[in-house]
A protein has these predicted regions:
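Long, well-ordered mid-to-C-terminal structural blocks that present hydrophobic/aromatic surfaces
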Residues: 99-178
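Long, acidic/polar, low-complexity amphipathic helices and coiled-coil-like
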Residues: 1-92, 96
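Conserved beta-propeller blade signature
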Residues: 19-23, 101-103, 169-170, 221-225
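Beta-propeller fold detector
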Residues: 1-7, 52-55, 69-80, 130-150, ...
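Short, conserved, GDST-rich strand-edge loop motifs in beta-rich repeat architectures
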Residues: 23-55, 104-123, 171-182
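Repeated scaffold domains used in trafficking and secretory/extracellular systems
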Residues: 5-17, 81-94, 146-164, 205-217
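Loop/turn-rich, solvent-exposed surfaces of beta-rich toroidal or solenoidal domains
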Residues: 153-230
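Beta-propeller blade signature
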Residues: 1, 37-68, 118-134, 183-194, ...
């Protein structure tokens, strides 16, 4: 899935259909950096356009086979880009399930962007791709879309996701402060549900971190290592 990286220096200089800098959207020209600056994950170079120009769309590139010689790009305006982010880290949000669908999740991280043109108006949500379709018909399922919400009805905000088995995907979700808070909750998304996330209960109250990947055993149960402030 396309991540929210905007345009590199190479992308900026491209001529498209006779238009110089053709990948820069009209009215977005001032977002192109005129000098290098920033630091850490916010570092940038002159002639780069940081972050996406299409916050209300999700684009996915699909390669036909392992030769990577033929591909197609599909897009949807039901969700924002399918990528979790924390500083310089970008996290997977596409998972193939046992039912043959690829589920594409968006935490709508673009809500945190400073410029309104790069902020999404879309809530966190899920769409899917039917991998059993022919190459010509491979696209987003027009009949499947879920808005992701917490059990109390508030919009979900999450950092990471992992496919477990069956209909279940586990999310590392933020507390009630959303993206301004701490990702210290585990919740379960059932692909056949209405999008209401189920809280994982019984976790320690002083969790300070989670392992990067859960272990899925032969019965389909997920085991997650946690660290706590009390040791």
């Amino acid at each position: 899935a396309a991540v929210p990286m905007g345009l590199s220096q190479w992308g900026y200089i491209q001529t498209v259909n006779g238009k110089e800098h053709g990948y820069v959207r009209e009215g977005y020209e001032d977002l192109v950096k005129t000098e290098s600056g920033g630091s850490g994950s916010g570092k940038y170079n002159a002639n780069e356009l940081q972050w996406t120009q299409y916050p209300d769309e999700c684009w996915v590139a699909i390669f036909k086979d392992e030769t990577l010689e033929e591909h197609k790009v599909i897009k949807t305006d039901k969700i924002s880009y399918a990528c979790g982010r924390n500083r310089s880290q970008y996290y997977q949000m596409l998972w193939k399930a046992d039912d043959g669908y690829i589920y594409v999740l968006s935490p709508s991280y673009a809500k945190t962007m400073k410029d309104s043109r790069q902020q999404t108006t879309l809530p966190a949500g899920v769409v899917r791709i039917n991998t059993n379709a022919s190459w010509e018909n491979l696209d987003f399922d027009p009949n499947y879309y879920k808005t992701l919400k917490n059990a109390n009805g508030t919009e979900a905000a999450f950092l990471r996701s992992w496919y477990i088995s069956g209909n279940y995907i586990m999310l590392l979700a933020y507390d009630e402060q959303g993206f301004d808070g701490t990702a210290n909750r585990l919740v379960i998304f059932d692909t056949q549900s209405d999008g209401i996330l189920k809280e994982v209960t019984g976790l320690p109250s002083d969790i300070s971190g989670f392992s990067s990947t859960p272990y899925i055993d032969e019965t389909g149960k997920a085991h997650m290592v946690v660290s706590t402030e009390s040791g």
